[in-house]
Amino acid sequence: MATFRNNHMKTKASVRKSFSEDVFQSVKSLLQSQKELCSVTAEDCLQQDEHANLTEVTFLGFNEETDAAHIQDLAAVSLELPDILNSLHFCSLNENEIICMKNINKPLDISSDPLNQSHPSGMLCVMRVSPTSPRLRIDFIFSLLSKYATGIRYTLDTFLHQKHQLETTDEDDDDTNQSVSSIEDDFVTAFEHLEEEETSKPYNDGMNITVLRSQCDAASQTVTGHHLETHDLKILISSGQQKSLAKPSTSSVNVLGHKELPSVKTSVTTSISEPWTQRSFYRSSNASDKDSDLQKTFFSSSPAYSSESECSSPSPVIFLDEEGYQKSLKAKLELPKIPVMKDDIEDSDSEVSEFFDSFDQFDELEQTLETCLFNKDPVIGKSSQRKGHKHGKSCMNPQKFKFDRPALPANVRKPTPRKPESPYGNLCDAPDSPRPVKASREDSGLFSPIRSSAFSPLGGCTPAECFCQTDIGGDRIHENHDSVYYTYEDYAKSISCEVLGSVLRTHHTNTLSNINSIKHGENKTVTFKHGNLDQKNKSKNKSLMIKDSIQKFAADLVEKSFGSAFKDLQKGVSSCTNALYHLAIKLTSSVLQMAFDELRRQRAFSLKERAISGLANFLVSEALSNALKDLQYVKKQIFTNTVARFAADLAEELVFEGIMEVCQFSYPQTPASPQCGSFDFEDKVVKLYAKDLSESVIQEAFIELSQVDVTFTTKAAVSVSTDNIKYVSAESVVPSTQAVTFSPSFHNQAIMVTKPVQEYKKEYTVQQALFCTSGIVTSIPVPLAGSALLPYHISSTACQAKAHLSSDDSNSNGDSAQVHIATKNREEKAACLRNICLPSEHNPGNQNDFKPTNDDIEMQSSSKLPNDPAIISNFSAAVVHTIVNETLESMTSLEVTKMVDERTDYLTKSLKEKTPPFSHCDQAVLQCSEASSNKDMFADRLSKSIIKHSIDKSKSVIPNIDKNAVYKESLPVSGEESQLTPEKSPKFPDSQNQLTHCSLSAAKDCVPECKVSMVHGSSLETLPSCPAVTGQKSDLKESAKDQPLKKHNLNSTSLEALSFGQENPFPHSHTFSSTALTCVDGLHVEDKQKVRDRNVIPDTPPSTPLVPSRASSEWDIKKLTKKLKGELAKEFAPATPPSTPHNSSVGSLSENEQNTIEKEEFMLKLMRSLSEEVESSESGELPEVDVKSEHSGKKVQFAEALATHILSLATEMAASHLDNKIIQEPKVKNPCLNVQSQRSVSPTFLNPSDENLKTLCNFAGDLAAEVITEAEKIAKVRNCMLFKQKKNSCYADGDEDYKVEEKLDIEAVVHPREVDPFILSLPPSSCMSGLMYKYPSCESVTDEYAGHLIQILKQEGGNSELIMDQYANRLAYRSVKSGLQEAAKTTKVQCNSRMFPVPSSQVKTNKELLMFSNKEHHQEADKKRQSKRNEGYFCKNQTCERTLDPYRNEVSQLYSFSTSLVHSITKDAKEELTASLVGLPKSLTDSCLFEKSGYEEDNECHVTPELPKSLQPSSQNHRFYHSTGSLNGYGCGDNVVQAVEQYAKKVVDDTLELTLGSTVFRVSETTKSADRVTYAEKLSPLTGQACRYCDLKELHNCTGNSSQHFFRQGSLASSKPASNPKFSSRYQKSRIFHLSVPQIHVNLDKKAVLAEKIVAEAIEKAERELSSTSLAADSGIGQEGASFAESLATETMTAAVTNVGHAVSSSKEIEDFQSTESVSSQQMNLSIGDDSTGSWSNLSFEDEHQDESSSFHHLSESNGNSSSWSSLGLEGDLYEDNLSFPTSDSDGPDDKDEEHEDEVEGLGQDGKTLLITNIDMEPCTVDPQLRIILQWLIASEAEVAELYFHDSANKEFMLLSKQLQEKGWKVGDLLQAVLQYYEVMEKASSEERCKSLFDWLLENA
């Protein structure tokens, strides 16, 4: 029994349906049903296009305990819902009733999926679920079943039919606009049917009404507001009969649809309650005309009307048809006289008002429908059949009958009264005047329509106002006579009377009687007394017969003539009135229509206008703001450019003048003269000079600027100058480090000129910041770097002076330089300049000092004096290095190279010879001064060369000068450089002290130098790498530097390192992006930092990516000018030219202080620009390298010397690093340790034994030669590539390193130690260095570093990829660490460090070496070597192509990242798992661990499946290495695996989720989302930017074992997307944003749109994934992020490990990565089964998703292998989905298959799709599993094609449904199984009872 209730919501109709016991019959049919189970999908997998066909039903369950609060909660579903429910008295529902409501607006709460907005909201079924009924009782299930069945069927029918009909019949929805005649026809037919059926179907409450046919009319379909105002209409719907129809217009619904579903029979009754009075259900004809079965349901009118009044016209407007009208006209008339009186004519206004009233009533469709009797008496042909007799209020033509008319003239007869028995008598107000028995023929109906309005209001007239109606006898009663009628009648009568009178003279009585009756007021009675007249006439004498006949004749005559006339007249009049009325109607309706249209149009127009204007305003404002921004920017640019240009010109002039001036100061001093005093004096002079100069310059500048068309106010000048200061100073700082070597004199001069010492101090902040940044670059904790720098400020100058004085030129330079560097770059500049200038003068002293060790000691003391001599020495070393580098660079032109070679030879010799004189050569190198004694000459030359450089900016000039200088000096400039080193170094070989000094130049610098030497050591380490890389760049230079450095190696190296580092500190920051972390920079910087940071052990120096160690002279000049600019700017800082230099300086200082922050920012920017410049210069430099290659022989010699030092130092350093580690070869260790201690500044370490030196030298020589050659080759090959892929530089270096490594490998056995340094030099990018897990400091460093980098990058707005990388690094690092810790906890496995025999001794040595060097690097090296050996040079063979890949850049970074990540992960994991690892298949763990390291290894690593064998787990430190050996046990301990899995999950999840998510979001905000997407799309095929690292790692790894591993893992993850939806979706989101990172400039509009799209997509996806794939709660993975993440990570990791294990074991011998790949892909499927957690194992992806890999195959087309995100647990398919936005095909793991099934299953169906949402109002006791199953059953029975569930917890159900479908279960089977389950459960014991329905079904399936 279904109740329609009016919810007073215009849009909703509710139907209350209840079920009789018949339901149980239908249940039987269900039990036997053999229908297929429909496919089930999570709502999230819904595709956009499916939403259109989607029918949605929501079941809302409540019970007795549901209270108001619960109901109010439903506001979340729909705001109106609580009110509707309450108004429906839903609480009164009984157990077998449900209420169906349509069109409940669904707010976002329910359909957060944006797709859901598009489809019409569905049905809401409210049902009572009484908790009292025992849950396991079968009848409870039946009642649930029936409720769901009714709701679902009702919904389907409603919506499907509605769709049908909206398509087929939506013609005449607006009934008021139908043409009148069609309405009339409608009702005619309707009433005829009614009449026929009325008798057979008496209307009663039990009346059976069937389901609507599909032809149900459109009126009912369009539910208008009125329809819904009905009150309680109960409709019983029974499926039995299809013939009759109950169609309440309120139900905008077809109950149960025309496709009757046999299984459920519901019977429905209809009853009507009181409020139906005066309501008419009005329905348009369309369907009803066509379908004779259709019936109107009529409801008895309100009790006010008698039962007789059973007919009322259903339609407000009814006309006679033409035929009836004709008939009415044929009736004979008696024509009265026609007195025309004003009163009798109703004014037209009243008619019009009536007309409109009739419409009002017409619109109230509340009048009840009343059946009308149709008089269908065929006998009465004459009488027109009034098709709808209107009675009561529904009269059709109610004309007010005016009873207050004045009396008719006496001769007019009264109308005849109605017969008393006339059915209409009771309707008349006329007095009961007697009625003559006989009705004369004149009574035949004369219908006078003249005054009757066709549109008189419905039911608005009194009973008397009816039309004349024929009574059964056919008599016509004329009731509504008009005045006209009376006039005619009287006229006729008077004429006839006169005629008769004239003939018979007997008419008086009649006339009198008429007059009397009129006087009596009987005119009200319309009675004709013709009968009496006739009788009187007849009663006359027979003699009067003639008269009678005459009378008759006259009467006939009159009748005929007048009758015909009147008939014609009547016809004309009526047609006229009809026409007029029609016209009036049409006019009014059209007028109204037009008016409304106009209103609507105007409103729309205004809205549109408003919208457009709003839009326009917005656009205009945007445009304006953008324009303004651009304008400002342009202005700024113009201004800056102008100022910059001016500054540059100025700087050049200044430089020239300044140099000239300075040259005057640089008069030679006698060695005896007190150098310190002169130095101080000169300082003052220089400062004063600088100030004066700056004043004049400033004045000139203002003059210049005033001429520029840029408005240049003082303020502007000030700001500009400050900016410049910041910019330039920053720049100069960088260059200073970089360019120091080139023209320290310039720097010194400039600095000296412009800055007083105090300034330095104040500026230190900026410089410090710079340093910090450089430190950051190298991943030194900022604070450390800062602290290191602080001491230098004050001391630097003193140190410099002393250093200069005390130590040799080189030393002094070095020290001072170091000091300067320490002080800050500026100081460096200043110091260097001073040093250079002064040193040139002091040189003799220095040289002298230098030669003797005493001098060195003095130096040390002097340096000590300043502050931290060690630091100073470091800096000095760095400076020296830089200087040397720069000089070498400047000399690098071809000629120079030759000289360099010569020099090299000379130097090497001198080194051996230990020629102290050359010490000055350091300065000489700087200055190319030939004779150390000729300080003046040296100074002059220096200044000249510098000036020339600055002026000419041409390398050629420099070389010439250099040559000259060289010749004079007898050393080429490069020679000089080398000389510098050699000078020191010569001593080094000769005397142990010198050796010590030389080696570290520490002896000279003593403690400081030791530190320096340490620096050197580190730098050496770096150098080795540098040589490899630099070899390309300027191997010669480096080698030259290094060789001379042999002794000074330390210094020079450190310098080099510094110089590189410094040069690149910026590049470095930049380099990240560009030079793949210019390893050199990284190394050097690292070294520096390490030096500063004694804690930090120099990790493997990243191979020097082509840091342009030797910038062209132009570069130097640029740097110089920059510095100058900086100084100038400082001077300028005071807006106006300072009145006194002091003031200006003070002002600048204060400003500087204020602007420190800005300066720092500037520095960052500066670093950036510098790095760019450096990079560009790098590209320039490569060719030079090639040129150098010509002189390979000399190079080799040089290389030997260099190599010896490098190797010794590097090995020593490495050894020192490793002291805490278990070193397999202690011998190697010792020297290394020394080096390390050196860092600690223990001079002892500085003294390598002669033997060591010799062996090292020999080995180094060979090595160096090879390195150089290799490097050159590589450089040549890769020049272009390198530059293209700056990031790749590391990679390239790596290759070189590989080659070197190969060589080393060969030699490694012999000189394992030596190998180390190179290994150290492996390309681990700087990021990696930070990640070294070994050193605790490093961890923090990495974090800080990453953070800082990120900040810088963000500020620079620069490379989003870099930023992401940093994030990823940091994140990965943290997550890995924490994950490992977690894993350790969970596993509780103690680390057993085991060493396994290494298959090849070589490998062993390598390994050991590796161990010594940073593990990661070693690993890489080992792996690389091994992989090279084992599988051929991977890069060469397999990945040469890849090398070319643009990805290489990323690859290197990836390696670094992955390495670090992998290392830490593997390390920890292995540690924790070692014990259990034994149980794991060797390959498994190894591949896992090694692969990871392998990633870094690059392609080679990829090859590493074999690596595991070779690698030995040397020590715990090398946990990563627990090589295959450790894993030999094949039994995988579940716990281990699980631990790994957990850890992996956690790591992955936390990492990605937390970091990437948040950071990415931030980042993405800055980046424009549009680019995001586009970029993402671009990326999608090959590079997953998501976690670029992981991606690339995987990509590259894919090729090799690691790739398999990842691939496998990824495939696992991807293949099991269902299991970790949450995680994947999370990832996915972050990934999208990741992708977005790369591009930065986007239009706002696009951005907004894009962002929306992306967000929508992401959310959609995420949701989809969540529902389709999230593990069911039972799987044990909590939904809380952490636990979930953990479990997920664990799973991922485990799967990965397992897979890898299989893959490795299977493919160990496979050298071709492709084969590995295939194995891995197979493995993917295998692993699914192995999954130890088992939560995924249920998903049988093997069959369903074999194409899964293909779905994201394109990710790694380059490898031919489907990459996976598994390394970080990323889901490949997700990634793909995001990128390729047509995701819908493969979002859910199940979708594809389901779709195919549906295609098969539902071909014959109309493809019904149903979305079911269940809402429980607390406390509701339906078992959700039962509910889902039952709904599924019903939907299947109803032949739904696709069933979607909104509940996200139905993962298990998805599984179950899949299995059941596969097993071929039918609806009946499933229902029986459910019933059986409950029966079993009733009998089962309490333990068994806990088994859920799904589980039970799965078991029994």
From Swiss-Prot:
GO terms classed as biological process: cortical actin cytoskeleton organization; intracellular signal transduction; protein localization; protein localization to endosome; renal water homeostasis
GO CC annotations, alphabetized: centrosome; cytoplasm; cytosol; nucleolus; plasma membrane
Positions of modified residues (Phosphothreonine): 981, 1100, 1485
Biased segments, Acidic residues type: 1787-1801
Positions bearing Phosphoserine: 18, 422, 433, 444, 448, 1171, 1176-1177, 1242, 1337, 1580
Region feature Disordered, mapped onto this chain: 407-443, 843-864, 971-993, 1131-1153, 1708-1805
Biased composition (Low complexity): 1757-1772
UniProt KW keywords: Cytoplasm, Cytoskeleton, Phosphoprotein
Region of interest: PKA-RII subunit binding domain: 1650-1663
Ranges of Basic and acidic residues composition bias in the record: 1747-1756
Gene Ontology terms for molecular function: protein kinase A binding; protein kinase A regulatory subunit binding; protein phosphatase 1 binding
Biased composition (Polar residues): 1141-1153, 1713-1740
InterPro entries tied to this protein: SPHK1-interactor_AKAP_110
Ranges that cross the membrane: none
Name of the featured protein: A-kinase anchor protein 11
Organism expressing this protein natively: Homo sapiens
